[in-house]
Amino acid sequence: PRTAAHLTLTPRRGAFAAAYPDIVLEIVIEDRFTDVVEGGFDAGVRLGESLQRDMIAVRIGPDLRGAVVAAPSYFATMPRPRHPRELADHRCIRFRFSSGILYRWEFEKDGEEIEIAAQGPLILDEDHLIAQAAVDGAGLAFVFEPYVRAPLADGRLI
């Protein structure tokens, strides 16, 4: 998916090009599951939980953590959720995969796993846009931490 490409390939492509100047690197980014062999690709990048049973995998990046964030202006009028069940009372910015499926927010604490079908008036298909919508005060967003590291550090997000 795009997330895997943005967070693992993008930071490495310059070093790859310098180390292997004779190799033509073509990167195709899709959110749908593609059969790497059938598609004629030499390799594929996926998030760990998306691996097929007989696929050979090599870790190329760290574990990714999700974060629920919002702008201070959003929390000026809405209470901060203390548990995922409280998300039903909030405007959530949702993610739609290219397959049409809406992402269900996934939480885990002390071995307890919860999936929430978040609700809200804004649905996007790009993590960067979701993070920016949260900064703009559109609602709560569930995004991978690297996408919101800077706005969390400078106070644009909580």
Regions found by a protein language model. Give the residues of each.
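Central regulatory/effector-binding core of bacterial HTH transcription factors
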Residues: P1-R53
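C-terminal regulatory
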Residues: E38, S50-I158
